[in-house]
UniProtKB/Swiss-Prot annotation:
SUPFAM superfamilies: Glucocorticoid receptor-like (DNA-binding domain), P-loop containing nucleoside triphosphate hydrolases. GO terms for cellular component: HslUV protease complex. The keyword Chaperone applies. GO terms for biological process: cell division; proteolysis involved in protein catabolic process. ATP-dependent specificity component of the Clp protease. It directs the protease to specific substrates. Can perform chaperone functions in the absence of ClpP. Keywords: ATP-binding, Chaperone, Metal-binding, Nucleotide-binding, Zinc. The gene is clpX. It comes from the Bacteria. It comes from Buchnera aphidicola subsp. Schizaphis graminum (strain Sg). ATP binds at residues 122-129. It holds the Pfam family zf-C4_ClpX. Zn(2+) binds at residues 15, 18, 37, 40. This is ATP-dependent Clp protease ATP-binding subunit ClpX. NCBIfam families: clpX, PRK05342.1. Belongs to the ClpX chaperone family.
Length: 427
């Protein structure tokens, strides 16, 4: 009897949760016939904390919604020009999220419709940047889809559901967060119908995609395969309600102005034909785009049902030289500021003369690439010096003037020791 009692006293106590004995853990806390170790306590705390954090995220979602004035002011910090479009977007986004926040407070049971947006503007006018900046301000998931890659289900290409799948990826498959996100569909003009006339061949990347996008944009309970539906057909689907997802569609619509000009000038050709033709030439493409109507977009190749899902249409202006100069220097994340920060990492100052900045803007204007072409121009100018600089010593400043931009000379290097200007050739 004595030996058995000694054996029991020597028996090691164990954690009732993980099974580790008292020698394997730092602390072992006893309860009524139950033990828990410090490691399990820490794990339980983490689980509780994660639950609290998740709930807090859901409770705080859109707890603060900036006013249209505040939204536009924020956009002004990052996007140059396009004031009318900024106002349109600010009001549209505010109303969209105000509708979501107050859906339960609607005592009259008036159903507020969703106002998706169509942006029309040339390449490099700021369409994508506007949408990205809005999403960052509101702290909602944001994804970009390319309409040219989309096809009808069953054909080579991406299913339209992939648009929502990308949004889910951005928020780590948190469905509740994804349902409040913004989806930006670029190159929407490229899915226009190939012809006004019915065709015996199926238009799988044009009208077919428009038809497939209809329900998604309007609001539906979509079944989304987390890993893409075509390569993993056996996976479980996530149910995502798209009713509160804001869709912003954008495109250049390069031939649209011609369609509008024909409509406007039809019926005005009786007599004085020559004068009217001269007046028509004076009117810019921008003038005609400002007169856009739904029937013009139908003539372009968008189906009426699709246009109906995009009630807010706004036109972006082509950027002029002054706007491009401002884009290079003024915004918080201006290109020149970005490269100056990059050179600061090497403890070197980077300076552009006013003439150099103007010359860069003129180059981008001649290439007709808008703001998008500015980075490639600067990259080409600085390529050689960025290649050499990490291996160089005692460099104080790099100076870029107009002759450097026009490839007439090399960037000027100013050294610390003698403060002497030298060329990148190492003279």
């Amino acid at each position: 009897m004595t030996d058995k009692s000694k054996d029991n006293s020597k028996k090691l106590l164990q954690c009732s949760f993980c099974g580790k004995n008292q020698k394997e853990v730092k602390k072992l806390i006893a309860g009524p016939a139950v033990y828990i170790c410090d490691e399990c306590i820490r794990l339980c705390n983490n689980i509780i904390q994660e639950t609290k954090t998740t709930k807090k995220i859901e409770d705080d979602e859109l707890s603060y919604l900036p006013t249209p004035h505040e939204i536009k002011k924020h956009l002004d910090n990052y996007v140059i020009g396009q004031n009318h479009t900024k106002k349109v977007l600010s009001v549209a986004v505010y109303n969209h999220y105000q509708r979501i926040r107050n859906v339960s407070k609607n005592k009259d049971n008036v159903e507020l419709g969703k106002s998706n947006i169509l942006l029309i503007g040339p390449t490099g006018s700021g369409k994508t940047l506007l949408a990205e900046t809005l999403a960052k301000l509101l702290n909602v998931p944001f994804s970009i889809a390319d309409a040219t890659t989309l096809t009808e289900a069953g054909y080579v290409g991406e299913d339209v559901e992939n648009v929502i799948q990308k949004l889910l990826q951005k928020c780590e498959y948190n469905v509740k967060k994804a349902e409040l996100g913004i989806v930006y569909i670029d190159e929407i003009d490229k899915i226009s119908r190939k012809s006004d006339n019915p065709s015996i061949t199926r238009d799988v990347s044009g009208e077919g995609v428009q038809q497939a996008l209809l329900k998604l944009i309007e609001g539906t309970l979509a079944s989304i395969p987390p890993q893409g539906g075509r390569k993993h057909p056996q996976q479980e689907f996530l149910q995502v309600n798209t009713a509160n997802i804001l869709f912003i569609c954008a495109g250049a619509f390069s031939e649209l102005s011609k369609i509008i000009s024909k409509r406007i000038d039809t019926g005005n050709t009786i007599g004085f034909n020559c004068n009217l033709k001269k007046q028509k030439k004076k009117k810019s493409e921008q003038y005609f785009l400002q007169q856009v109507q739904s029937k013009d977009l139908i003539k372009f190749g968008l189906i009426p049902e699709f246009i109906g899902r995009l009630p807010i249409i706004t036109i972006l202006k082509e950027l002029n030289e002054t706007a491009l100069v401002q884009i290079l220097c003024k915004p918080k994340n201006a290109l020149i500021k970005q490269y100056q920060t990059l050179f600061n990492l090497e403890k070197v100052k980077l300076e552009f003369t006013k003439e150099a900045v103007t010359s860069i803007a003129k180059k981008a204007l001649s290439k007709k690439t808008g703001a998008r072409g500015l980075r490639s121009i600067i990259e080409n100018i600085l390529l050689d010096i960025m290649y050499e600089l990490p291996s160089m010593k005692n460099v104080e400043k790099i100076l870029i003037d107009e002759s450097v931009v026009n490839s007439h000379s090399l960037p000027k290097i100013i050294y610390e020791e003698k403060n002497k200007s030298k060329k990148a050739s190492g003279e």
